[in-house]
């Protein structure tokens, strides 16, 4: 069984398109678990209108934040294979099939994507090439290549990643990726792009060619996050 976990917050503009791109690749026994963080723009109404039994919308809570919202969705999931998805992207055909194939011999998979603008016009054809994303514990400690919207994993990764870190600097995708690097097998799939990674003014993660511009956090905060990650991941087995 596959569980696709989505954290939503005021995603009314794009959530329907994303859900359709995901549902078209799932079987009748799979699920999409959505945790909403108190949207006020009708996001949950749009989700309910789709009326697909595979969608499980959790009761809305406020102020969990992106990481807490994703952890909540993951905790509610039931699948042996877990995908993470953002509310504003689009999955391209063949993504689920390719990830399942790679997960036969890996614990966590990251697939490449094309970076687009709000209208899905391609801005960068490959996020991997733009940032030099690849596996490697030290590499991803210094420059995180774990984008949740590009990740799929075995449930065993989630079990090893618990308990979830209380430090807010350790984001859900970075934490899961680093745990998989430390305790299992990770694969970055670079030969094809399987997601349209939509960037617009409302997205939390921005795209820049600068090393420390993945987010708007200060350089000091980013250094503190890396030190915290090094301490937390050291004892994971």
Language model features: what each stretch is:
Residues 11-24:
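Short, well-formed alpha-helical segments that are part of the catalytic scaffolds
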Residues 14-16, 40-49, 94:
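Acidic helix N-cap motif at the loop->helix transition within catalytic regions
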Residues 21, 36-45, 62:
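A conserved acidic beta->alpha catalytic loop
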Residues 29-38, 58-60:
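Short beta-strand/loop segment that forms part of the nucleotide-sugar
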Residues 60-77:
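Glycine-rich, basic loop-to-helix element that forms the pyrophosphate-binding segment
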Residues 82:
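Short aromatic/hydrophobic "clamp" motif used to bind/position activated sugar donors
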Residues 135-208:
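Conserved nucleotide-sugar donor-binding catalytic segment
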């Amino acid at each position: 069984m596959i569980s696709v976990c989505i954290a939503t917050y005021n995603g009314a503009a794009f959530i329907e398109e994303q859900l359709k791109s995901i549902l078209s690749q799932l079987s009748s026994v799979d699920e999409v678990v959505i945790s909403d963080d108190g949207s006020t723009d009708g996001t949950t109404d749009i989700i309910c209108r789709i009326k697909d039994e595979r969608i499980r919308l959790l009761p809305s809570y406020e102020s969990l934040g992106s990481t807490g919202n994703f952890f909540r969705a993951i905790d509610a999931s039931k699948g042996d294979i877990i995908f993470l998805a953002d509310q504003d992207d689009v999955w391209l055909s063949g993504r689920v099939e390719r990830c399942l194939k790679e997960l036969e011999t890996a614990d966590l998979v990251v697939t490449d994507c094309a970076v687009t603008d709000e209208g899905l016009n391609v801005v960068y054809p490959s996020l991997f090439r733009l940032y030099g994303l690849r596996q490697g514990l030290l590499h991803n400690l210094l420059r995180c290549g774990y984008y949740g919207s590009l990740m799929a994993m075995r449930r065993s990764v989630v079990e090893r990643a618990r308990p979830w870190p209380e430090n807010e600097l350790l984001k859900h995708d970075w934490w899961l990726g680093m745990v998989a690097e430390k305790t299992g097998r990770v694969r970055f799939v670079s030969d094809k792009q399987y997601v349209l990674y939509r960037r617009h003014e409302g997205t939390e993660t921005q795209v820049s060619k600068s090393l420390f511009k993945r987010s708007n956090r200060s350089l000091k905060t980013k250094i503190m996050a890396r030190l915290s990650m090094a301490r937390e991941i050291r004892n994971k087995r």
